[in-house]
Protein backbone atom coordinates (compact mmCIF):
# COMPACT_ATOMS: atom_id res chain seq x y z
CA UNK A 1 0.00 0.00 0.00
CA UNK A 2 1.46 3.36 -1.05
CA UNK A 3 1.93 6.07 1.57
CA UNK A 4 -0.72 8.27 -0.04
CA UNK A 5 -3.24 5.40 0.22
CA UNK A 6 -2.91 5.17 4.01
CA UNK A 7 -5.42 7.30 5.92
CA UNK A 8 -3.85 10.31 7.68
CA UNK A 9 -4.56 9.19 11.27
CA UNK A 10 -3.32 5.66 10.60
CA UNK A 11 -0.09 6.94 9.04
CA UNK A 12 0.33 9.41 11.90
CA UNK A 13 0.05 6.61 14.47
CA UNK A 14 2.50 4.43 12.51
CA UNK A 15 5.03 7.27 12.47
CA UNK A 16 4.59 7.88 16.20
CA UNK A 17 5.16 4.18 16.84
CA UNK A 18 8.27 4.18 14.63
CA UNK A 19 9.63 7.10 16.66
CA UNK A 20 8.79 5.31 19.93
CA UNK A 21 10.52 2.16 18.71
CA UNK A 22 13.63 4.06 17.61
CA UNK A 23 13.93 6.47 20.50
CA UNK A 24 12.11 4.76 23.35
CA UNK A 25 9.48 7.49 23.74
CA UNK A 26 7.25 9.89 21.85
CA UNK A 27 6.87 13.27 23.52
CA UNK A 28 3.85 15.51 22.98
CA UNK A 29 6.34 18.11 21.67
CA UNK A 30 6.14 16.32 18.31
CA UNK A 31 2.34 16.18 18.07
CA UNK A 32 1.99 19.57 16.40
CA UNK A 33 4.71 18.89 13.84
CA UNK A 34 3.48 15.42 12.98
CA UNK A 35 -0.05 16.79 12.65
CA UNK A 36 1.06 19.45 10.17
CA UNK A 37 3.42 17.53 7.90
CA UNK A 38 3.64 13.75 7.98
CA UNK A 39 6.24 13.60 5.20
CA UNK A 40 8.57 15.98 7.02
CA UNK A 41 8.19 14.11 10.30
CA UNK A 42 8.82 10.78 8.58
CA UNK A 43 12.10 12.05 7.14
CA UNK A 44 13.06 13.69 10.46
CA UNK A 45 12.43 10.41 12.30
CA UNK A 46 14.68 8.52 9.88
CA UNK A 47 17.46 11.13 10.08
CA UNK A 48 17.36 11.71 13.84
CA UNK A 49 17.18 8.01 14.65
CA UNK A 50 20.48 7.10 12.98
CA UNK A 51 22.52 7.59 16.19
CA UNK A 52 20.01 5.45 18.07
CA UNK A 53 20.49 2.51 15.68
CA UNK A 54 24.25 2.84 15.16
CA UNK A 55 27.17 4.15 17.13
CA UNK A 56 29.27 3.64 20.20
CA UNK A 57 27.46 5.82 22.76
CA UNK A 58 25.03 4.28 25.21
CA UNK A 59 21.45 5.67 25.39
CA UNK A 60 22.08 7.55 28.66
CA UNK A 61 25.04 9.41 27.16
CA UNK A 62 23.02 10.24 24.04
CA UNK A 63 20.25 11.69 26.21
CA UNK A 64 22.74 13.73 28.24
CA UNK A 65 24.10 15.18 25.01
CA UNK A 66 20.55 15.92 23.84
CA UNK A 67 19.90 17.81 27.10
CA UNK A 68 22.97 19.94 26.41
CA UNK A 69 21.95 20.60 22.81
CA UNK A 70 18.44 21.65 23.81
CA UNK A 71 19.62 23.79 26.76
CA UNK A 72 22.38 25.58 24.86
CA UNK A 73 22.14 29.34 24.36
CA UNK A 74 21.92 28.74 20.64
CA UNK A 75 18.80 26.59 21.00
CA UNK A 76 17.11 27.07 24.42
CA UNK A 77 14.28 24.64 23.62
CA UNK A 78 12.75 23.94 27.02
CA UNK A 79 10.27 21.22 25.94
CA UNK A 80 13.24 19.30 24.52
CA UNK A 81 15.23 19.81 27.72
CA UNK A 82 12.33 18.38 29.71
CA UNK A 83 11.80 15.41 27.37
CA UNK A 84 15.49 14.48 27.36
CA UNK A 85 15.85 14.87 31.14
CA UNK A 86 12.97 12.41 31.54
CA UNK A 87 14.64 9.98 29.16
CA UNK A 88 18.08 10.39 30.72
CA UNK A 89 16.62 9.62 34.14
CA UNK A 90 14.92 6.52 32.72
CA UNK A 91 18.30 5.41 31.36
CA UNK A 92 19.87 5.83 34.80
CA UNK A 93 21.38 9.31 34.69
CA UNK A 94 22.07 10.81 38.09
CA UNK A 95 21.28 14.32 39.30
CA UNK A 96 25.00 15.03 39.30
CA UNK A 97 25.42 13.93 35.67
CA UNK A 98 22.54 16.10 34.48
CA UNK A 99 23.80 19.06 36.52
CA UNK A 100 27.23 18.61 34.97
CA UNK A 101 25.65 18.85 31.51
CA UNK A 102 24.17 22.22 32.48
CA UNK A 103 27.52 23.35 33.86
CA UNK A 104 29.29 22.35 30.65
CA UNK A 105 26.74 23.92 28.32
CA UNK A 106 26.68 27.17 30.30
CA UNK A 107 30.20 27.86 29.04
CA UNK A 108 28.71 28.60 25.60
CA UNK A 109 27.51 31.91 27.02
CA UNK A 110 31.10 33.05 27.52
CA UNK A 111 31.28 33.69 23.79
CA UNK A 112 29.16 36.80 24.29
CA UNK A 113 32.04 38.10 26.38
CA UNK A 114 34.84 36.91 24.10
CA UNK A 115 33.14 38.48 21.07
CA UNK A 116 31.88 41.63 22.74
CA UNK A 117 34.83 42.56 24.93
CA UNK A 118 37.38 43.16 22.14
CA UNK A 119 34.85 45.33 20.31
CA UNK A 120 34.21 47.24 23.53
CA UNK A 121 37.96 47.82 24.02
CA UNK A 122 38.32 48.99 20.39
CA UNK A 123 35.42 51.41 20.77
CA UNK A 124 36.78 52.76 24.05
CA UNK A 125 40.12 53.43 22.33
CA UNK A 126 38.33 55.06 19.38
CA UNK A 127 36.29 57.26 21.72
CA UNK A 128 39.43 58.26 23.63
CA UNK A 129 41.21 59.07 20.36
CA UNK A 130 38.28 61.19 19.13
CA UNK A 131 38.15 62.97 22.48
CA UNK A 132 41.87 63.81 22.26
CA UNK A 133 41.60 65.03 18.64
Region locations from a protein language model:
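Short acidic/histidine-centered micro-motifs embedded in hydrophobic/aromatic stretches
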Residues: 67-68, 101-104, 123
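Amphipathic, charged-and-aliphatic alpha-helical interface segments
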Residues: 62-77
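Mid-chain, well-packed structural core segment of small domains
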Residues: 73-99
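Alpha-helical scaffolds flanking conserved acidic
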Residues: 59-64, 95-100
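Acidic, glycine/proline-rich low-complexity segments that act as flexible tails and inter-domain linkers
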Residues: 1-61, 90, 116-133
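C-terminal structural segments of small proteins and small subunits
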Residues: 108-117
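Alpha-helix C-capping/helix-to-loop hinge sites
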Residues: 50-54, 68-72, 88, 105-108
Amino acid sequence: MATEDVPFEERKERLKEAFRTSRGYFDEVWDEIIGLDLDFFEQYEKFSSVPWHHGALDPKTKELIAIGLNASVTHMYMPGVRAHIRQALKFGATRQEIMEVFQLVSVLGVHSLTVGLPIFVEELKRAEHEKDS
